[in-house]
């Protein structure tokens, strides 16, 4: 899924979620030297030097603003082969997972992302059986896929083993999806994994990816979408994160144009609110391959009232009404998305 707060090590393969560009190494040094109110062994380069005791995310992807959360306690810090991993207890959003200085999820609002990126595609097709997750090492998407009793096989390819281990330790209610016996975990590069998938294998592919910068750029380009289309059966569906209409319409235009060239079934944009993501929202591309028609805007496959996994809590965010509403776009975004690539 590099950041603007510090020039940290970048992975060369598939990252998890939303890494940022390298920027301002001096901010890291200043933060290290500041008195942030935490114990010495709990200090972090991402604790703000301006607001001691607060975590601050400053990004070129949301210029002119910053997002800060008050830190009650730093629970974990580590460096994997690909990124820096931080977990802290916040005052208002519960535990927070941060990769390379970028918030990936919080206990309070993760449901809005995990539930929507998963159920928008899976509730739009009848009886999905084989599902592939690219990225998503925290296990949240797995948790949501496991609610669907028709699913027989859930494959996940995550590049960073540390993210999986940290999620299981500090976010058990998110990582609970790993307990499902249908799950097959592959540690490795998701792009390479997808290239080796036999044609027509999956009913659905869910891409829990990073932003289209740096090494993740290829996840939003034609070759990657072509690999997804090849891996899907006729009438199969893909769901992938697609940035913010408030900040990234130029990126969304390119994604929509690429998808319309590759996916001959349907191409749609939906969105949800996530307070700790840039601009407080994030979008998804929902596409289908040529074959049985898929009407993403009208769900046909309701989630079981009782999940096969009894340890999973009831849905917090998703329902059929919000499913339909998520495809309603502001006029400025609707004009661009409906005309791009046609």
UniProtKB/Swiss-Prot annotation:
Residues 9-42 are annotated as: Disordered. GO terms for biological process: spermidine biosynthetic process. InterPro entries: PABS, PABS_CS, SAM-dependent_MTases_sf, Spermi_synthase, Spermi_synthase_euk, Spermidine_synt_N, Spermidine_synt_N_sf. The gene is SPDSYN. It comes from Solanum lycopersicum (Tomato). Its EC number is 2.5.1.16. The lineage of its organism: Eukaryota, Viridiplantae, Streptophyta, Embryophyta, Tracheophyta. Residues 52-289 form the PABS domain. Keywords: Polyamine biosynthesis, Spermidine biosynthesis, Transferase. S-adenosyl 3-(methylsulfanyl)propylamine binds at residues 83, 114, 138, 158, 189-190, 208. It is an enzyme of class 2 (transferase). This is Spermidine synthase.
